[in-house]
Swiss-Prot record:
Record field: catalytic activity: ATP + H2O + a folded polypeptide = ADP + phosphate + an unfolded polypeptide
Molecular functions per Gene Ontology: ATP binding; ATP-dependent protein folding chaperone; isomerase activity; unfolded protein binding
The protein's assembly and partners: Forms a cylinder of 14 subunits composed of two heptameric rings stacked back-to-back. Interacts with the co-chaperonin GroES.
CDD domains for the chain: GroEL (cd03344)
Cellular compartments per GO CC: cytoplasm
Organism: Mesorhizobium japonicum (strain LMG 29417 / CECT 9101 / MAFF 303099) (Mesorhizobium loti (strain MAFF 303099))
Family per similarity comment: Belongs to the chaperonin (HSP60) family.
EC annotation from Swiss-Prot or TrEMBL: 5.6.1.7
UniProt name for this protein: Chaperonin GroEL 4
Database matches in PANTHER family: 60 KDA HEAT SHOCK PROTEIN, MITOCHONDRIAL (PTHR45633)
Length: 551
């Protein structure tokens, strides 16, 4: 086992504090509408420019092991906030730095660290409750746009685009952010159920210009296995021909004789038909076929259920107003499924999302949920250069997360004002002087975000904080973008409660642990061995080679 280096009390805390400060100082320059960018060197490709706190934090690794421990603990704050709320990482870092700095001073002055931590926890739980009470629910699309705009650093076009996407796909719908191939940023909404499988043969195309197969008011046959023998399909094909409606076949695969016969019938004009492979693989394929069945009001034809293809009647087929199939995708619009059954399926998938521990499964379940609940919107972020696109994509991601959080738990005044107000309204009293000091540490820390936003905008932080606190209006604050004071909510400067709450809870949890640290252990740096004379002469006379050793 390698030798360890151990540091105690003041020495340990000072080294740790240095690490915390290095990381927090790099992150906090990005806070607020006038926050600056950070350039990160990449081992390959162009440097990355970002204003996203967690991206900056994740890049920082310090040489000194003890300083690095402090930095990594604060990095954990940013990552945790990012995982839960998706935004507010810089605020969380600023709060954590302030609590650690003030806590360090208090411990150095001889206070009991455990009591300080109790005081910190008391104050934080009171502030979280107060934020919940002050929250204002979001009702209009304009309010959604405001949240998005603030989080995208005052970029109104991003806010509007996110509001439009949410309006179209609903709060359950999935909104994804991709890099565009052009310089324009655009929004594309896919309504209905879309999956990434195209037609099995180009002969199924109905619109040769666009190379798509459009089926209006179609029947949909969902089959779990491969279809290679046409004989079993004849009864159902004949029944569909009688109705003169088109048919879409979704199965694991259609091959050989079956595919050839379908194509020939299509070309002769007797049968309006198209076939696609089922989406997904393994168990997920079964689940997705079930989803399509519920959406279209049909049944999955499966040997497991004892349903044979020969016995399938029209009543087992799904129905949809329109099906559009391109080379890569199939979209089913307006399925004939019952509302109650779709709702039941949505609730079931939500339950699975709650229970799963794998991020990958969660993402896939969320996609399925969106396809059932309303559709998928894609925001394609464009820019003149790759570096610009990446920077903008970071902001759009943040804005999207903030908007979701706002819809979930409501909004409070932005610009650090909600926390600043909370600092003046903490009523909790500690059981002793040290706990009271812990409560005061949180009081001071709650002012840090508003002060940092002001100083990043070139204003004097103390004057701004003083002016805001003098005015008793709950939403009165400082607009760093214009340099004016006024009602933050009226000016559209709002923060999601979830983001502010998560930032404070995560910051206090990690900072509280750092304050109570008394010893630190890290691997000792390896000492380089002096002069290399030993191996050379060993073979000579006995120990003759030792001459090179430098005692």
């Amino acid at each position: 086992m390698a030798a360890k280096d151990v540091k105690f009390s003041r020495d340990a805390r000072e080294r740790m504090l240095r690490g915390v400060n290095i990381l927090a100082d790099a992150v906090k320059v990005t806070l607020g509408p006038k926050g600056r960018n950070v350039v990160i060197d990449k081992s390959f490709g162009a440097p990355r420019i970002t204003k996203d706190g967690v991206t900056v934090a994740k890049e920082i690794e310090l040489e000194d092991k003890f300083e690095n421990m402090g930095a990594q603990m604060v990095r954990e704050v940013a990552s945790k906030t990012n995982d839960i709320a998706g935004d507010g990482t810089t605020t969380a870092t600023v709060l954590a730095q302030s609590i650690v700095q003030e806590g360090h001073k208090a411990v150095a002055a001889g206070m009991n660290p455990m009591d300080l931590k109790r005081g910190i926890d008391l104050a934080v739980s009171e502030v979280v409750a107060a934020l919940g009470k002050a929250a204002k629910k979001i009702k209009t699309s304009e309010e959604v746009a405001q949240v998005g705009t603030i989080s995208a650093n005052g970029d109104e076009s991003v806010g509007k685009m996110i509001a439009e996407a949410m309006q179209k796909v609903g709060n359950e719908g999935v909104i994804t952010v991709e890099e565009a191939k052009t310089a324009e940023t655009e929004l594309e909404v896919v309504e209905g159920m879309q999956f990434d499988r195209g037609y099995l043969s180009p002969y199924f195309v109905t619109n040769a210009d666009k190379m798509v197969a459009d089926l209006e008011d179609a029947y949909i046959l969902l089959h779990e296995k491969k279809l290679s023998n046409l004989q079993a399909m004849l009864p159902v094909l004949e029944a569909v021909v009688q109705t003169s409606k088109p048919l879409l076949i979704i199965s694991e695969d259609v091959e050989g004789e079956a595919l050839a016969t379908l194509v020939v019938n299509k070309l002769r004009g007797g049968l309006k038909i198209a076939a696609v492979k089922a989406p997904g693989f393994g168990d997920r394929r079964k689940a997705m076929l079930e989803d399509i069945a519920i959406l279209t009001g049909g049944q999955v034809i499966s040997e497991d259920l004892g349903i044979k293809l020969e016995n399938v009647g029209l009543n087992m087929l799904g129905r949809a107003k329109k099906v559009s199939i391109s080379k890569e995708n199939t979209t089913i619009v307006d399925g004939a499924g019952k509302k109650a059954e779709i709702q039941g399926r949505v609730a079931q998938i939500k339950q699975q999302i709650e229970e799963t521990t794998s991020d990958y499964d969660k993402e896939k379940l969320q996609e399925r949920l969106a396809k059932l609940a309303g559709g998928v919107a894609v925001i394609r972020v464009g820019g003149a250069t790759e570096v610009e696109v990446k920077e903008k994509k970071d902001r759009v991601d943040d804005a999207l997360n903030a908007t979701r959080a706002a819809v979930e738990e409501g909004i409070v005044a932005g610009g650090g004002v909600a926390l600043l107000r909370a600092s003046a309204n903490i009523k909790a009293a500690g059981a002793n002087a040290d706990q009271a000091a812990g409560i005061n540490i949180v009081r001071r820390a709650l002012q840090a975000p508003a002060r940092q936003i002001a100083s990043n905008a070139g204003a004097e932080a103390s004057i701004v904080a003083g002016k805001i606190l003098e005015n008793k209006g709950a939403t009165f604050g400082y607009n760093a973008q214009t340099g004016e004071y006024g009602d933050m909510i009226a000016m559209g400067i709002v923060d999601p409660v979830k983001v502010v709450r998560t930032a404070l809870q995560d910051a206090a949890s990690v900072a509280g642990l750092l304050v109570t640290t008394e010893a630190m252990i890290a691997e000792a740096p390896k000492k380089e061995s002096a002069g290399g004379g030993m191996p050379g002469g060993m073979g000579g006379g006995g120990m003759g080679g030792m001459g090179g050793m430098d005692f």
